[in-house]
Amino acid sequence: IPTGIFNAENLKDLSLLMKKTDSILRLTHEQSFFIITNDENVDLIKNSTIYKKFDSFHNIYFNNQIACAGVNECSFGVIPNKADAIEMALYLNTHIPISDAKIRMYWSACPKGCGVHGVADIGFEGAIAKDENGSSCNGVKIFIGGKATKSVLEARQLTKAISIPKAQEVVKELLNIYKTQKLENESFESFDSRILSILSIEEIQNRIGL
């Protein structure tokens, strides 16, 4: 579910499908859910309208994604956030498609960190940045290398506040390194532990053209 945006109509359709197939819905902390069902129900669920509505988001950039409410719903928010997270995921899936991988991208619209960006593989903190003309614009600070599965570790700050379009380019270059150097089925978290964590921030910045 892209950034957890799931309205009442969607929930009604899903609940009817769960009842029809005698399935169980399990929510995740990454603003999505799993459908637990029997084998004979799989095709029926995959052919349902509600499944098809969200099927295009089933890729590594949406599967483990968190984004807090953002400026439209929260007085502390600096950027829209959810829309920015969705735009980033769509951009990356177009330019750096990866199938055998896992990457946790968490977005917080302000330094308070409700999107838990500090433990993300790649975290984003909403900020005011400068565009290429020097004008103020929505932006993010990017963090990398947070740990939240096998261990817990705070992410390192990779960039100062940069515009959203610039952030897309930066993350694309970072994930290009991941795609070309990762092991089969290696998660970004494991890749960071094996490769990126032994590099200084300056070395990583140089590799991605910052």
Predicted region positions:
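Small-residue-enriched alpha-helical segments and adjacent helix-cap loops
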Residues: 1-134
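Short acidic (Asp/Glu) and glycine-rich catalytic loops that position anionic groups and cofactors
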Residues: 26-31, 61-70, 144-156, 171, ...
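Intrinsically disordered, low-complexity regions enriched in small/polar residues
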Residues: 35, 56, 145, 190-193
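Alpha-helix boundary/capping detector
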Residues: 94, 136, 200-204
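Mobile "lid/hinge" segments at catalytic clefts and subdomain interfaces of large enzymes
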Residues: 118, 123-180
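Extended hydrophobic packing segments that form well-structured cores
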Residues: 157-210
